[in-house]
Amino acid sequence: MNRVTIRVPATTANLGPGFDAFGCALSLYTDVTFQETEEVGLEITGCDEEFTGPDNLAYASYCAVLASLNEPVKGVKIHIDAHIPVCRGLGSSAALLVAGAMGANVLRGNRLSTQGLLNITNAMEGHPDNLAPAFYGGLTASMVDNGLPVTVNFPLHPGWEFLALIPDFNLPTSLARSVLPEQVSRADAIYNISHGAMVLKALELGDEKLLRNGMQDKLHQNYRKKLIDDYEKIEALVRTTGAAFCLSGAGPTLLCITRNPGLEEKLAKKLDSITEHTWQMLPLHVEFQGAHIV
């Protein structure tokens, strides 16, 4: 085999209080095709020219896996068919890292486990919250122990509906991290630990009220929302519907989770009239299948 296409789901990280720990795979995808060539060299298509060099994340993780296998990097053509918007808090970077790692592994006979691929990509990304659900699918919680990620899947009630509100502007993760404090109070740490536990149980039980209350956070959202125009107006509107609400990852995408149908229609009636930017509403569901060959 000298050609493979990997499909990776979008992911939403944090889910409110689960900062750098919780993640969930969603029904939006990026496909990346890797084709080895006889000639040494790199050709990347399907993305902006600025991402066609050797620092492309899919190529970087592809090379990292080959290096871990003590395999030379041959010539390769990479085509990216991305439907996950860039710098919107939906795991676009993680999708490329996962695709590159899995693509290289498949082309070398699947010699590394999924955990091995997660170890390599986590060393590149720095946190496993998006990577874990991209690899494993579903709802995950992760920690880093002695430098290595440890991930578990959690059950999800089948009745949840997700609605992503995606703005017409981006927010680089580096900027979203730069506004966070270096230290937090003990009270805020306890607040997030307790609320995070409630989020996981609420998602399992299908308890919308518990989820709505549990998704409150004191570690990152209050700082990041200042970077997102319309945040407080949209949050207030969503609260009137009874849906749970949080930042998707570092933002700027906002995520609504509900068990009641018709949320998109309810928001559509008022969203444009209260916001300065254009917000795309994208209904999604949980994707229980992680990255795989197509």
Predicted regions and their residues:
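ATP-binding N-lobe of GHMP and related small-molecule kinases
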Residues: M1-R88, M102, V106, N110-L112, ...
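Solvent-exposed alpha-helices and their adjacent loops that cap or buttress functional pockets
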Residues: T12-N14, G23-L26, N70-P72, G89, ...
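Glycine-rich beta-alpha junction loops
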Residues: L28, E38, G138, I166-L171, ...
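Short beta-strand-to-turn element immediately C-terminal to the catalytic PLP-Schiff-base lysine
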Residues: Q35, A134-Y136, T140-D145, C256-R259, ...
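Gly/Ser-rich oxyanion-binding loop with an adjacent helix/lid
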Residues: A67, P72-V150
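Active-site rim beta-loop-alpha module in soluble metabolic enzymes
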Residues: A164-K225
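Glycine-rich, charge-dense phosphate/pyrophosphate-binding loop(s)
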Residues: L203-V294
